[in-house]
């Protein structure tokens, strides 16, 4: 059994992460899950949420926007629409997006065609604010 997991995280635009890590957690369609070296093969979809990994005793956090997560032979492959490292998130911009989404949602009902769009925008902004806050506390 390997002592580390090889993680490759890719968006349609670039490779965001290529590291050997001790453990990794993410938010799947059915909730949060964690993976350690030696994990059985596994494939799941990801929803808007946080990905966290520990490397050499240090925790790292990222905000993700939809994708897929696969584990095979101590290799983790993460394919996502977008990914932002905690220390790269502009907290003021994320808070502004959160405010805009909240304002738009106040005037809509679940039956409105734009409701789900702003609901997803709100969820993305919340995750970005939470993850950015974790970078500030390092």
UniProtKB/Swiss-Prot annotation:
Tagged with keyword ATP-binding: no
One GO CC term on file: proton-transporting ATP synthase complex
Major location (coarse): membrane
Localization per record: Cell inner membrane
Pfam families per the UniProt record, alphabetical: ATP-synt_DE, ATP-synt_DE_N
InterPro entries for the chain: ATP_synth_F1_dsu/esu, ATP_synth_F1_dsu/esu_N, ATP_synth_F1_esu_C, ATPsynth_dsu/esu_N
Molecular-function annotations in GO: ATP binding; proton-transporting ATP synthase activity, rotational mechanism
Membrane topology classification: Peripheral membrane protein
UniProt KW keywords: ATP synthesis, Cell inner membrane, Cell membrane, CF(1), Hydrogen ion transport, Ion transport, Membrane, Transport
Coiled-coil spans in chain: none
Subunit structure: F-type ATPases have 2 components, CF(1) - the catalytic core - and CF(0) - the membrane proton channel. CF(1) has five subunits: alpha(3), beta(3), gamma(1), delta(1), epsilon(1). CF(0) has three main subunits: a, b and c.
Family the UniProt entry places it in: Belongs to the ATPase epsilon chain family.
Function: Produces ATP from ADP in the presence of a proton gradient across the membrane.
Name of this chain's protein: ATP synthase epsilon chain
Organism: Citrifermentans bemidjiense (strain ATCC BAA-1014 / DSM 16622 / JCM 12645 / Bem)
Lineage, top ranks: Bacteria, Pseudomonadati, Thermodesulfobacteriota, Desulfuromonadia, Geobacterales
Gene: atpC
